[in-house]
Design a protein with these regions (language model features):
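N-terminal secretory signal peptides that target proteins for export/translocation
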Residues: 1-18
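Generic alpha-helical structural signal
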Residues: 9, 18, 37-38, 63
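Bacterial N-terminal signal peptides
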Residues: 18-37
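Sensor of tandemly repeated, compositionally biased sequence architecture
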Residues: 4, 34-42
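Predominantly soluble domains enriched in secretory-pathway, periplasmic, or organellar proteins
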Residues: 39-361
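Generic short N-terminal amphipathic or hydrophobic helices
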Residues: 5-6, 27, 329
Length: 361
């Protein structure tokens, strides 16, 4: 259409249309290669994340859930919850190495480098955690838990693994099952309000646990010594809070909700919201890049990048394109990389894949 317009204007000068067409095509051939690639390069250089590798996952459907990393063994683990497997990738290249079967619906993964073992949470209308050999990839043992096993968080100080379970539609309470990761034993439970919870964070001392009480639209604070809920902070005008990161040095807690997609900053001393910003839809994982003071929240189609200016001020700096339901991610600061899993639930033609992004200065 633009070429026809130019030809028409050119024709008004007295030149024949055929001559004008040759001139237009020549100009396009000369200038498009010069300007278009340089614009793309500049955009990539300015972006906070640069896609450096993609590993397609043909034959997979449904959702991925959470990652785990084995730095020494150069492995990346990914829970393929609807495929009923844990996938193993080369951490540096993204190459697929192995598929661990034997699960019903795997969710969270804890890698134990001292013993080269994994603990995998597994459940929906059932519940268990599985201990997996990191060499043979065989399931060595399981612990039965209430139905609805889902997310989990590890306390490196006590070596306890807190696993969400129980609840369900209409339930008044649910549980955090405490698994002694060193001895692989169920050693206790913490009762939480509402029918379920999502992401959690533990302070450096291993004394407090923060949890998204998604069933009641609150953030909960648990005293890990007494195993009691000691505070409940309402999430204003939003619900389905999924992601969480703790910035302990600034006394700040970051969470992200899905309805609407919003990033919140809480003051951990007061339980009050400091500020909020829009973020990626259908978010599930979020990470704090401490050296660069950046937050990465992964959701469907994009990763939101937010810059922390100081404890109270935050700036939305980018929406980095990813893929459909690309909500699952892990930050590996040792490699300056963000790994993202593109899912496919509800979309028959979805192209599931592992994406590797290099963090830019």
């Amino acid at each position: 259409m633009r070429s026809q317009t130019i030809i028409g204007r050119c024709g008004s000068t007295g030149l024949k249309p055929a001559v004008c067409l040759v001139l237009v095509e020549t100009l396009i051939a000369l200038f498009l290669p010069v300007f278009h690639p340089s614009t793309s390069v500049n955009a990539q250089e300015k972006a906070p994340l640069k896609l450096i590798a993609t590993t397609p996952s043909p034959g997979f459907s449904g959702d991925f859930d959470h990652f785990a990393v084995d730095l020494k063994g150069n492995r990346l683990f990914l829970a393929a919850e609807d495929h009923k497997t844990v996938e193993v990738f080369d951490l540096r290249t993204g190459k697929s190495l192995h598929s661990i079967a034997g699960f019903g619906q795997p969710h969270a993964i804890l890698f134990l480098p001292d013993t080269n073992k994994l603990i995998v949470t597994d459940g929906d209308d059932f519940g268990r955690v599985a201990l997996v050999d990191g060499k043979s990839y065989e399931v060595l043992d399981t612990i039965k838990l209430p139905p609805g096993v889902d997310g989990a968080i590890f306390n490196p100080q006590t070596k306890d693994y807190y696993v969400e379970s129980g609840g369900g539609t209409g339930a008044a309470t649910h549980l955090l099952n405490i698994i002694d990761a060193k001895n692989f034993k169920h050693v206790g439970d913490i009762t939480l309000p509402g029918n379920h919870s999502e992401a959690m964070a533990v302070d450096r001392a291993g004394k407090k646990l923060y949890v998204n009480l998604t069933g009641t639209n609150e953030v909960g604070v648990v005293d890990l010594a007494t195993r009691q809920l000691i505070s409940r902070w309402p999430v204003p005008n939003a619900k389905v809070e999924n992601s969480m990161v703790l910035d302990e040095s600034n006394h700040r807690l970051f969470i992200a909700t899905r309805q609407p997609p919003t990033f919140f900053v809480f003051d951990t001393d007061t339980g009050k919201v400091v500020t909020s910003l829009p973020c990626a839809a259908f978010n599930d994982d979020m990470w704090f890049d401490r050296p660069r003071k950046r937050i990465y929240a992964t959701g469907s189609e994009t990763t939101t990048v937010i810059q922390q200016r100081d404890a109270d001020h935050y700036e939305h700096v980018a929406e980095v394109p990813t893929g459909y339901r690309a909500k699952t991610s892990i930050l590996v600061p040792e490699l300056n990389r963000l790994y993202v899993a593109v899912s496919g639930k509800g979309k028959p033609d979805a192209k599931l894949a592992l994406q590797i992004f290099q963090i830019q200065p």
